UniProtKB/Swiss-Prot annotation:
Predominant cellular place of this UniProt entry's protein: membrane
PANTHER family: HISTAMINE RECEPTOR-RELATED G-PROTEIN COUPLED RECEPTOR, TRACE AMINE-ASSOCIATED RECEPTOR 8
Localization per Swiss-Prot or TrEMBL: Cell membrane
Similarity annotation: Belongs to the G-protein coupled receptor 1 family.
Source species of the chain: Rattus norvegicus (Rat)
Disulphide connectivity of cysteines: 21-185, 96-189
Membrane topology: Multi-pass membrane protein
Function recorded in the entry: Olfactory receptor activated by trace amines. Trace amine compounds are enriched in animal body fluids and act on trace amine-associated receptors (TAARs) to elicit both intraspecific and interspecific innate behaviors. Ligand-binding causes a conformation change that triggers signaling via G(s)-class of G alpha proteins (GNAL or GNAS).
Pfam family for this entry, one: 7tm_1
Keyword terms of this UniProt record: Cell membrane, Disulfide bond, G-protein coupled receptor, Glycoprotein, Membrane, Receptor, Transducer, Transmembrane, Transmembrane helix
Gene giving rise to this polypeptide: Taar8a
Protein name as annotated: Trace amine-associated receptor 8a
Length: 344
């Protein structure tokens, strides 16, 4: 007796290799669409953040402690776009890892390190904005270039050390050796982390996030009070002193910068919260999340690396002007670094 139903042949990542992972390919049309969407995100992350870095480093008018933090943040997002997203794109769409076990560990380590670096940068930027808004006249003496350098160093060194410890010592797999062995196959790159380290990861996301929420809540409260005070001062006295006028201008500028970077922080939290919650649920409830849901959460987080330059371009006229000068080749001219980017 023959069956009327034909079963689709099982596809493997490596057809002629024992213990190969099973391949679950998408339809050709969907594969093309996904490559376009994911590829666009990677290109945008690379090009957009490269423009931010070039702008801050080239134009002397942008050489400030706060902007150095922004350039360092853009460097982390640039590295996500160039060293993480392209390989994750192939893994997500082909459902196979074709780049070897050694690079799998390196890729996973870089993925975690650069993303935590972004989070640390944003946390320090929140501190910077809090000082700038609450005490704008004293701010230049408190948040100096050396302080900014210390913040940048911490934002890079701690994530790199932590990620290396997690992915290269094997400590994160303690207690789940059987699960790791069951998931191990040729053509896979699934780094499984035990519940303790997933909880640590969650706290590393939650604590800086809470710090940023508290600081920005205080920032906008102070900004509102300043706006009311300035409005009352102007309406009550037409002959405003030059000092008060200067203080009002400085406060207004810092409030605008805080608002822009506040949007950046919100974008980061919205992008990363689904992924963080998903990994927490999977670790404590037995990996119940469907693969496609995990991929959506993962790429939502990746796309955050491409969003910051778009936010800067929308809110910062100086960044739009810098982009024009860079793309037109004007920065190749002598003395271009001293060009004015701000309209007075």
């Amino acid at each position: 007796m023959t069956s009327n139903f034909s079963q689709a042949p099982l596809q493997l990542c490596y057809e002629n290799v024992n213990a190969s992972c099973i391949k679950t390919p998408y339809s050709p049309g969907l594969r093309v669409l996904l490559y376009m969407v994911f590829g666009f995100g990677a290109v945008l992350a690379v090009c957009g953040n490269l423009l931010v870095v070039i702008s801050v480093l080239h134009f002397k008018q942008l050489h400030s402690p706060a902007n150095f933090l922004i350039a360092s943040l853009a460097s982390a997002d640039f590295l996500v776009g160039i060293s993480v997203m392209p390989f994750s794109m192939v893994r997500s769409i082909e459902s196979c890892w074709y780049f070897g076990d050694t690079f799998c560990s390196l890729h996973s380590c870089c993925d975690a390190a650069f993303c935590y670096s972004s989070l640390f940068h944003l946390c320090f930027i929140s501190v910077d904005r809090y000082i700038a808004v609450t005490d704008p006249l004293v701010y230049p003496t408190k948040f100096t270039v050396s302080v900014s350098g210390i913040c940048i160093s911490i934002s890079w060194i701690l994530p790199l050390v932590y990620s290396s410890a997690v992915f290269y010592t094997g400590i994160s797999a303690t207690g789940i050796e059987n699960l790791v062995s069951a998931l191990n196959c040729v053509g896979g790159c699934q780094i499984v982390v035990n519940q303790d380290w997933v909880l640590i990861d969650f706290l590393l996301f939650l604590i800086p996030t809470l710090v940023m929420i508290i600081l920005y809540s205080k920032i906008f409260l102070v900004a509102k009070q300043q706006a009311v005070k300035i409005e009352t001062s102007i309406s009550g006295s037409k002959g405003e002193s030059s000092l008060e006028s200067h203080k009002a201008r400085v406060a207004k500028r810092e409030r605008k910068a805080a608002k822009t970077l506040g949007v950046t922080v919100v974008a980061f939290m919205v992008s990363w919260l689904p992924y963080t919650i998903d990994t927490l649920i999977d670790a404590f409830m037995g990996f119940i999340t469907p693969a496609y849901v995990y991929e959506i959460c993962c790429w939502s987080a990746y796309y955050n690396s491409a969003m910051n330059p778009l936010i800067y371009a929308f809110f910062y006229p100086w960044f739009r002007k810098a982009i024009k000068l860079i793309l037109s080749g004007e920065i190749l001219k002598s003395h271009s670094s001293t060009m004015s980017l701000f309209s007075e």
